UniProtKB/Swiss-Prot annotation:
Name the UniProt record assigns to this protein: Hemoglobin subunit beta
Annotated organism of origin: Tragelaphus strepsiceros
GO biological process, one term: hydrogen peroxide catabolic process
Family that this chain belongs to: Belongs to the globin family.
Modification sites for Phosphothreonine: 11
Secretion signal, residue range per the UniProt entry: none
Domain Globin: 1-145
Length: 145
């Protein structure tokens, strides 16, 4: 998946990420760009407009929770399937989330990182993070296979 150099790069960069800001924005953008994903968050209240989604405190809080889990995965890049096994089971067996949504969220996360960090988020770092989000999405989808 990742070389030692790539792991070092993504891990060092992740230390700069403000999980609460980036998580809320990433989940919010997922819900705006891919509105069918909103069906999993009906209890979050008003998701009727982009502004409502992006300013919804429940979206922000859950986005932080998602990125807290992602942060844990960043500490276990060699065992993503093991790290995300319980979440895979939850999302498959109880929540019935389409595993394609994990890929969508990963791609949105990469967009948000690029937006927040600009030139510091180099093409090489983007490529490395694309590998990470793909690995996390595959780990979360593991229970479905």
């Amino acid at each position: 998946m990742l070389t030692a150099e790539e792991k070092a790069a993504v891990t060092a960069f992740w230390g700069k990420v403000k999980v609460d800001e980036v998580g809320g924005e990433a989940l919010g953008r997922l819900l705006v760009v891919y509105p069918w994903t909103q069906r999993f968050f009906e209890s979050f209240g008003d998701l009727s407009t982009a502004d409502a989604v992006m300013n919804n405190p429940k979206v922000k809080a859950h986005g932080k929770k998602v990125l807290d889990s992602f942060s844990n995965g960043m500490k276990h890049l060699d065992d993503l399937k093991g790290t995300f096994a319980a979440l895979s089971e939850l999302h498959c067996d109880k929540l019935h989330v389409d595993p394609e949504n994990f890929k969508l969220l990963g791609n949105v996360l990469v967009v948000v990182l690029a937006r927040h960090f600009g030139k510091e988020f180099t093409p090489e770092l983007q490529a490395d993070y694309q590998k990470v989000v793909t690995g996390v999405a595959n780990a979360l989808a593991h229970r479905y296979h």
